[in-house]
Amino acid sequence: MADLKALKNRISATRSNAKIFHAQELIATSRITRAQARTAAQAPYAQEIVNVLSAVAGATNMTHPLLADRSNPKRAAVLIITSDRGMCGGYNHNVLKACDELCEMLKEHGTEPVLYVMGAKGIAHYSFHDHHLAGQWSGFSMNPEYENLKSPLEHLLDSYLTGSGGTLSAPDGSEIAGCDAIYLVYTTFRSMLSQIPTVRRMIPIEPVYDDDPITLGEDLLSDPTDSDSLSPEYEFEPDAEELLDKLLPRYITTRVFAAALESAASECAARRTAMKAATAVSYTHLRAHETRGNL
């Protein structure tokens, strides 16, 4: 009788878990649609600021501090985007692993990595391993907004402009040295079944190259859709140098916001996949327990 009672309790608990997992799967599925829509809606703005920045940069010979590589960089800021909640499979593990690999590479080149983390799970991971964080933010991984990124990016830009030879106030109020480069570690959303941990150097800004092949007889500056077209000429007001000063920080904010949106979509997709698998396993165990109880 005791064994039968324990089996009934196990059946009840397994059925309850299966319902919870299935509910989480449905919630994640509904959120993916919204996350994908936000990512798609932001894409034209991100592309347009790249186009404008390219036009402005091409109209000036000024060497901007956000574009120039520094010799012998001593410190590099690493901003990692993780989730606030769990139950999303290997989502956080994969992005944290990519961060660890980046940190090892930086150390091999004599550069000290300085970690900044978005997301409660990433913060908990580094706190558990007694790893000091120069900055931490949480509470918006599923629904990031520009306002959420204002404080982190202002601090990171100040840190880069200060450089490793100077000091500035950290988000927690302590004094820390500046940095000579800024890296971003996040998750790229490819599909419902594929989310790729990604590392990007944000500052100094890396040039973006077009991978499309050039056809024979086509010039690098020509428009492949119209061989007679010419690049437009622009007149800037105020001048191109002043515009570049304003546009580069906005470009960086746009890139990080796009990464946060992709990470949110990736988190939803990873959670849906994990909960779907957990639901299937729960029902498999439930059927096994019920079969045993009927013997």
Predicted regions and their residues:
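Conserved AMP-binding A3 loop
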Residues: 295
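C-terminal beta-strand-loop-alpha-helix "lid" module of Rossmann-like NAD(P)-dependent dehydrogenases
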Residues: 1-287, 292
